Amino acid sequence: MMSQPPKVLLLYAHPESQDSIANRVLLQPARHAQHVTVHDLYAHYPDFFIDIHHEQQLLREHQIIVFQHPLYTYSCPALLKEWLDRVLSRGFASGPGGNELEGKYWRSVITTGEPEAAYHQQGLNRYPMSDIMRPFELTAQMCRMHWMTPMIIYWARRQSAETMKHYARAYGDWLENPLPHGGV
């Protein structure tokens, strides 16, 4: 008997989603997976008034949380930052009694506007992507979540359609079997 994949909450945050071909292509396999909930934050909260209790309930119902967004100013879009600050509150995700996310998994799926070579000591950005991702990794740690290796699509808008299909297939394959050794 095959076990069901764990429930995945895909938090998608892109303020100009209609213009992001790369992110639309990446979302396709997720939208077809029964165990994946795609939650478009900008579609749900165009006014930035986040329903904290609803968001926290979604987190409780899923084992793997995917944060899919473009890299904006070495971070995430503003609404996702607001979401992180408000939803992952003390007493829920951290601090005394804040163990609701303990043991869950965090994976970031990031698109960038620059090539991979820009993310090195001698590159345009002077720091590797692992350094830029550190605040997200530390947030996962604060929430007692397991940090998973991020999926980074460099220079996303300049990727060929074939290359983006390859990334989407790899993403879809991962979504079907997201945990090493299949266990939660």
UniProtKB/Swiss-Prot annotation:
Primary localisation category: membrane
Enzyme Commission designation: 1.6.5.2
Reactions catalysed according to its record: a quinone + NADH + H(+) = a quinol + NAD(+); a quinone + NADPH + H(+) = a quinol + NADP(+)
GO terms for cellular component: plasma membrane
Keywords: Cell inner membrane, Cell membrane, Membrane, NAD, Oxidoreductase
GO BP, one annotated term: positive regulation of potassium ion transmembrane transport
Pfam assignment, any one: Flavodoxin_2
Top-level class of the enzyme under EC nomenclature: oxidoreductase
InterPro entries: Flavodoxin_fold, Flavoprotein-like_sf, K_H_efflux_KefG, KefG/KefF
Coiled-coil residues: none
Superkingdom of source: Bacteria
Molecular function terms, GO-annotated: electron transfer activity; FMN binding; NADH:ubiquinone reductase (non-electrogenic) activity; NADPH dehydrogenase (quinone) activity
Lipid bilayer topology: Peripheral membrane protein
The keyword Oxidoreductase is annotated on this UniProt entry: yes
Location within or outside the cell: Cell inner membrane
Function statement: Regulatory subunit of a potassium efflux system that confers protection against electrophiles. Required for full activity of KefB.
Assembly and oligomerization: Interacts with KefB.
Family in the record: Belongs to the NAD(P)H dehydrogenase (quinone) family. KefG subfamily.
Protein name: Glutathione-regulated potassium-efflux system ancillary protein KefG
Gene: kefG
